[in-house]
């Protein structure tokens, strides 16, 4: 009888101990999941903060009317610098987020690595954009405090080759970063050929026609060509342009980089086969480069400035669009990776302490 009672007591003790251990295990599991969910909340909050900061810093900078008549060339540099600064802040915040993710408790290691990989990829793209924007900002700054569309003395001036080269390279790098991120770059519609600089009233005469000085009417024609130019086609012309030293344009010159190098007395047929897009592209190249200025009659001074401002805003607008799409594409990839973070009952510490001889079953759940 006594042995039976002892056996019953022992059985009850074992049952109670088992229940206690189970309750403790369930408590620890619940605490682990709570810690995991707390980590997810912090990660999510950090990601939302990045979106907020980016929108706040870039919201005012991005747009299709970055400059206006009377603004200096350096204003374009300020525009690029503001966007670059915003991307730098975003890149720094992504690094902080990566550190937070590394500290996440009870998270499946492979899903954590997927997020960190997405962040690293985005950071590389942002760095490429920042470098390109810095290059463009520095070039515009070096162009000085000359007004956009400067034609004060009615004598054309060639854009410096080094400046034009830097602009072309900067635009190419931005497009390269976008394409790397899966953003589609359009070619646009370049438009029909426009009249060459045979007459002083032709649009291209402001480059330095065969009489060296444009006369009244050329400015209005140039403004008209720029107004109908497709921004995507302008970007394509800039991307494929080749910089040149200051020259007197020969007949048939139509490359945007070469047109921007016109310094005086162009051939009567200079600009043959040029179109609205190429006209706008060399206007932009001249406005961001040191030395670039136009020939215009006094009565056309305002029209030439308006044409230059319009060309600059069209290019800035499409570049801003490309940058925004590129940034959004990379942040969306990070967002999807964050959504894929899974819970794991096995922490890195647990795995280390268990030793190599004992295989570990990694239990994961969404």
UniProtKB/Swiss-Prot annotation:
Q: What is this protein called?
A: Variable large protein 10
Q: Which family does it belong to?
A: Belongs to the variable large protein (Vlp) family. Beta subfamily.
Q: What UniProt keywords are attached to this protein's entry?
A: Cell outer membrane, Lipoprotein, Membrane, Palmitate, Plasmid, Signal
Species of the source: Borrelia hermsii
Lipid moiety-binding residues (N-palmitoyl cysteine): 19
Topological relation to the membrane, as annotated? Lipid-anchor
PROSITE patterns xrefs: PROKAR_LIPOPROTEIN
Q: Where is the lipid attached (S-diacylglycerol cysteine)?
A: 19
InterPro entries linked to this entry: Borrelia_lipo
Q: What does this protein do?
A: The Vlp and Vsp proteins are antigenically distinct proteins, only one vlp or vsp gene is transcriptionally active at any one time. Switching between these genes is a mechanism of host immune response evasion.
Per the record, a Pfam family?
Answer: Lipoprotein_2
Query: Which compartments does it reside in?
Result: Cell outer membrane
Q: What is its main location?
A: membrane
Miscellaneous note of the record: Genes for both Vlp and Vsp families are on (usually) unnamed linear plasmids in B.hermsii HS1.
Q: Among its keywords, does the record have Signal? A: yes
Q: Where is the signal peptide?
A: 1-18
The gene that this protein is the product of is vlp10
Question: Record's Gene Ontology CC terms?
Answer: cell outer membrane
Q: Does the keyword Lipoprotein apply?
A: yes
